[in-house]
Amino acid sequence: CQLQNYPNPFNPSTKISWQVPVSGWQTLKVYDILGNEVATLVNEYRDAGSYNEEFTINNLQLSSGVYFYQLRVGDFVETKKMILLK
């Protein structure tokens, strides 16, 4: 699985992209530095393939700093870091 976001650092939005080789239930969530869930971008069954979702802070009261995005596909979990610069 290839998981990345661009641009990073970002403000006000970043595109998170990934590829998965198998079909399955996918969840993509964003967390703050304390582990609090900020957003759920994906929570559905998807086929194998390449995907991308945009994370935008427009309606969220988020401060500058480090955030994490986590992709879960079946038993697979990957977490990456991104930085919001205001």
How should these model regions be labeled?
Residues 43-44, 53-55, 80-82:
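Generic detection of short hydrophobic beta-strand segments and adjacent strand-loop junctions
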